[in-house]
Amino acid sequence: MATDEATKPSPIPPYPEMILAAIEGLDDKSGSNKSAISKYIEGKYGSLPPAHASLLTAHLARMKESGELVFLKNNYFRAGAPDAPPKRGRGRPPKARDPNAPAPAPKSPSSTGRGRGRPPKAKSPLEAAVKQATAGMPKPRGRPPKKAKTDGAASPSPSPAPAPAGDGSTPGKRGRGRPPKVRPAVPSETAAA
């Protein structure tokens, strides 16, 4: 039994400890990337599990999220290190303001003029009353029917009278589809004589 314990290799320390030791051991001012950390751990602790790469990636991500490590430009830094860059938020940083420049005057609402976009439609009292009355009712299914044209919607100039039909019938509502081709009158023999 004593020989089994002597030949058994010492267990490797937890991954967070190995990662922090690797970053300290590499001691690079620009930080340590994942491959450098992995090579350092493989060199120092020879017997690693077969899933070493995925375990290292998972632990680096967890330590980055918890704030133990700072990740910048594909390199990892210790969070408490004095040479670690400050953590930046996402997106473009705001422009630096000139301290000597005067502050811009606040705009008054009357000087701005009309707002952006299309002006709102004027609401008629009838539409408002109908909307209030039908507020609790369920909406009907399907497409709503077309609204009938009113006299106010017509153009101010009267439209010209429709041209008479080619067959001499009174103009009326046209049927559906393409109209039949108008055939020229065939000269009769009696008219030629």
Curated annotation (Swiss-Prot):
Keywords: Acetylation, DNA-binding, Nucleus, Phosphoprotein, Repeat. InterPro entries: AT_hook_DNA-bd_motif, Histone_H1/H5_H15, HMGA, WH-like_DNA-bd_sf, WH_DNA-bd_sf. Residues 87-98, 113-124, 138-149, 173-184 bind DNA. A motif (Nuclear localization signal 2 (NLS)) lies at residues 145-149. One of its GO terms (molecular function) is sequence-specific DNA binding. A motif (Nuclear localization signal 1 (NLS)) lies at residues 86-92. The keyword DNA-binding applies. Residues 11-81 form the H15 domain. Residues 75-193 are annotated as: Disordered. One of its GO terms (cellular component) is nucleosome. One of its GO terms (biological process) is negative regulation of DNA recombination. Belongs to the histone H1/H5 family. Confers resistance to nickel NiSO(4) when expressed in yeast (e.g. S.cerevisiae) by counterbalancing nickel impact on cell cycle associated with an increased chromatin condensation. This is HMG-Y-related protein A. It comes from Zea mays (Maize). The lineage of its organism: Eukaryota, Viridiplantae, Streptophyta, Embryophyta, Tracheophyta.
